[in-house]
Amino acid sequence: MFTYATKSEKEETNSVSLSGEIVTEPTFSHEVFGESFFDVKLKVPRLSQTFDLLPLTVSERLTCNFPLFVGQQISLRGQLRSFNKQVDNKSRLLLSVFVRELLPYDSALSPNDVQLDGFLCKQPVFRTTPFNREICDLLLAVNRAYGKSDYIPAIAWGRNARFVKFLPVGQEVKIIGRLQSREYQKKISEVETETKTAY
């Protein structure tokens, strides 16, 4: 769902709620002011009986009293963050859910809910898929504390795609949706391909 945001509606600009199963052991990611952060993958079910494998970034402060292990069912709240990383001498925009709260698994919660309030930083790109579905690619700048911003790609479908395709750069919008993963094959030579994941 896409809506125009107004100042009176201003609340949390970046909110993620997920429930699923831990499928990788926590691996060290980085350290900030002596605090260690770890990368974990969460398997989140879809209604279509498939699932998404979503990247999490978790502070050691959270796992002290809530250790994570493969096969564990959890719920969480956090924010969708972006960062640039050098891969093969190219800068890539990577996404991860920055976990702010770990919770016991709760089947009553929505397993995958994302709410963003930000600004369009590129002109929306409207297109039709090979399956004749209308979609619109967006890039949203979501502000956070200390003057930083996260740059979040999003896809609007159907009626929402037609609604947002003419919005101007700089337009503030509120997005409610899901975080999904999609594997694709990237050709790296005439005979070799590499499997990558987009979010």
Task: Kindly give the residue locations of the regions a language model identified.
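OB-fold and OB-like single-stranded nucleic-acid-recognition modules
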Residues: 1-199
